[in-house]
Amino acid sequence: MGTWILFACLLGAAFAMPLPPHPGSPGYINLSYEKSHSQAINTDRTALVLTPLKWYQSMIRQPYPSYGYEPMGGWLHHQIIPVLSQQHPPSHTLQPHHHLPVVPAQQPVAPQQPMMPVPGHHSMTPTQHHQPNIPPSAQQPFQQPFQPQAIPPQSHQPMQPQSPLHPMQPLAPQPPLPPLFSMQPLSPILPELPLEAWPATDKTKREEVD
């Protein structure tokens, strides 16, 4: 019995011992053995603690020099600056470079104003509150210079009829059209199919019976 007990104790100790440091997997630390084992095991445990941290830090630090952390932040800031300039009026120099993206981005805001009062005035009030808070003066100066120009009016005119006028007008004729279209094909299809099918089935059945 003593040998079996010793064997079980050794197995338990072997499974409970911390694993050696491995580059792929962080070690499993058991704090209960901190007092009972010698400094060597403690050093192994500390190595287990440090190696995963170092490996994790190395994994984090490697991509930044390769991608360039500072230029990345600068690129993000540069990308955000034109977006802010589109909303704010002072920077007019970047607007001519981004006529195409700026016009579609701001025009949907303008057609929303005529669209919102049609369904309900309550939805119009929050848009008014949000617009003066963020770009109240931005939309006015943008619309003023766009009107004299030739490119914005062309793209601004199709946007207005597409959003408020066209979707509202076809909605009225659409409901009557589907029932008329569905009734017309149903009337000729129903009589044609049975007339063609019955005589064929009758002939085959008669031949088989005969």
Curated annotation (Swiss-Prot):
This protein's GO CC annotations: basement membrane; cell surface; endocytic vesicle; extracellular region; protein-containing complex; supramolecular complex
Family, similarity comment: Belongs to the amelogenin family.
Phosphoserine modified-residue sites: S32
Known partners and oligomeric status: Interacts with KRT5.
Protein name, per record: Amelogenin, X isoform
Organism listed in the record: Mus musculus
Function in brief: Plays a role in the biomineralization of teeth. Seems to regulate the formation of crystallites during the secretory stage of tooth enamel development. Thought to play a major role in the structural organization and mineralization of developing enamel.
Cellular localisation: Secreted, Extracellular space, Extracellular matrix
Pfam families from the UniProt entry: Amelogenin (PF02948)
Post-translational modification (record): Several forms are produced by C-terminal processing. Phosphorylated by FAM20C in vitro.
Entry-linked PANTHER family: AMELOGENIN, X ISOFORM (PTHR46794:SF2), AMELOGENIN, Y ISOFORM (PTHR46794)
Region (Disordered): 109-187
GO BP terms in the entry: amelogenesis; cell adhesion; enamel mineralization; odontogenesis of dentin-containing tooth; regulation of cell population proliferation; response to calcium ion; response to nutrient; response to xenobiotic stimulus
GO molecular function terms attached to this record: calcium ion binding; growth factor activity; hydroxyapatite binding; identical protein binding; protein homodimerization activity; sodium ion binding; structural constituent of tooth enamel
Biased composition range(s): Low complexity: 109-119, 136-169
Leader sequence segment: 1-16
Listed Pro residues bias regions: 170-179
Disulfide bond residue pairs: none
Lineage: Eukaryota, Metazoa, Chordata, Craniata, Vertebrata
Record's keyword terms, sorted: Biomineralization, Extracellular matrix, Phosphoprotein, Repeat, Secreted, Signal
